[in-house]
From Swiss-Prot:
Coiled coil: none annotated. The gene is MT-CYB. It comes from Phyllonycteris aphylla (Jamaican flower bat). This is Cytochrome b. Belongs to the cytochrome b family. The chain crosses the membrane at residues 33-53, 77-98, 113-133, 178-198, 226-246, 288-308, 320-340, 347-367. InterPro entries: Cyt_b/b6_C, Cyt_b/b6_C_sf, Cyt_b/b6_N, Cytb/b6-like_sf, Cytochrome_b, Cytochrome_b_C_euk/bac, Cytochrome_b_N_euk/bac, Di-haem_cyt_TM. The lineage of its organism: Eukaryota, Metazoa, Chordata, Craniata, Vertebrata.
Length: 379
């Protein structure tokens, strides 16, 4: 008799995705981050659901409702800090997942890669709107600054901003509409994840060597299920440690002050995971130019597959490209640091140099280095 998991209409979909899925035998721990992102998304949706039961999206009560969750709701503080730090963990896994894709040439699966870029935009939008909801000082001023960037769009910019605000500044209507969108977007993200996996399973996974692994496949279960569970345990331990020992480590102290439109914080900045893009935005004196650079800092990833000039897929056997990749990581860390600094000398010039280097590495140096490597290998 055939196993029910192979015949049942629903179970056979799960079976072909997580049980009998053929996977390359050489996948390293860098391939764990996809499943870790799935766990992060599940944690965020569950904690967010319970937080939404107690939260009120009204400017008069939003800040107090978050305080009420932390003080009066049973384990409400755990939910709140799991959700806030879960977002940080989500972005750590997300950036490592993208880095893995760049290093090992996974971007050559263009459909999967492009859906991934859409996912990144959706997750960033979700995180931004979530940051506004506690209605602290940084929530209010962050929302004001970031939404105001849309006014740089010629002709329709100001109308668009006021349409999003629901008034002439960030008001009650803005908070009220951000809440349902913040609630809805994670489910759209979950749907996009399904499409992402659908395209991935059309081609099968890449592997560290970048060489087709069709002759050497193993079943996903039990080999990679066990490996993924170990990853879950490590990540959840790290998240729990952060939540229980230093929940405010990655937050901004200004957000413990209720939003006040009359007092501007000395230094407005987004959450740490947006600082690299914020630094690129600030490095261009022109408003429209800055906004374009901000969008392109993410969209540039879509151009990477078109600029792949190497005869090899992975960087595993390409030391020059490896050096360039780690230089790119250093540039991104520098941008993250600069994004959190005030707009003054020498931070301005460091940010401008790092921004130029970021685009140069991805668009010029990497393709040229690949051509040099091909020549050195006489290909």
């Amino acid at each position: 008799m055939t196993n029910i998991r192979k015949t049942h209409p629903l179970l056979k979909i799960i079976n072909s995705s997580f049980v009998d899925l053929p996977a390359p035998s050489s996948l390293s721990s860098w391939w764990n981050f996809g499943s870790l992102l799935g766990v992060c998304l599940a944690v965020q949706i569950l904690t967010g659901l319970f937080l939404a039961m107690h939260y009120t999206s009204d400017t008069a009560t939003a800040f107090n409702s978050v305080t009420h969750i932390c003080r009066d709701v049973n384990y409400g503080w755990v939910l709140r800090y799991l959700h806030a730090n879960g977002a940080s963990m989500f972005f750590i896994c997300l950036y490592l997942h993208i880095g893995r894709g760049l290093y090992y040439g996974s971007y050559m699966f263009t459909e999967t890669w492009n859906i991934g870029i859409l996912l990144l935009f959706a997750v960033m939008a979700t995180a931004f709107m979530g940051y506004v909801l506690p209605w602290g000082q940084m929530s209010f001023w962050g929302a004001t600054v970031i939404t105001n960037l849309l006014s740089a769009i010629p002709y329709i910019g100001m109308d668009l901003v006021q349409w999003i605000w629901g008034g002439f500044s960030v008001v009650k209507a803005t908070l009220t509409r951000f809440f349902p969108f913040h609630f809805l977007l994670p489910f759209i993200v979950a749907a996009l994840v399904m499409v992402h996996l659908l395209f991935l399973h059309e081609t099968g996974s890449n592997n560290p060597t970048g060489i087709p692994s069709d002759p050497d496949m193993i079943p996903f279960h039990p080999y990679y299920t066990i490996k993924d569970i170990l990853g879950f345990l490590i990540m959840l331990t790290a998240l729990s440690t952060l939540v229980l020992f230093s929940p405010d480590l990655l937050g901004d102290p200004d957000n413990y002050m209720p939003a006040n439109p009359l007092i501007t914080p000395p230094h407005i900045k987004p959450e740490w995971y947006f600082l690299f893009a914020y630094a690129i935005l600030r490095s261009i004196p022109n408003k429209l130019g800055g906004v374009l650079a901000l969008v392109l800092s993410i969209l540039v990833l879509a151009i990477v597959p078109l600029l792949h000039t190497s005869k090899q897929r992975s960087m595993m056997f390409r030391p020059l490209s490896q050096c360039l990749f780690w230089f790119l990581v250093a540039v991104l860390l520098t941008l993250t640091w600069i994004g959190g600094q005030p707009v003054e000398h020498p931070y301005v010039i460091i940010g401008q140099v790092a921004s130029v280097l970021y685009f140069l590495i991805l668009l010029v140096f990497m393709p040229l280095t690949s051509i040099v490597e091909n020549y050195l290998l006489k290909w």
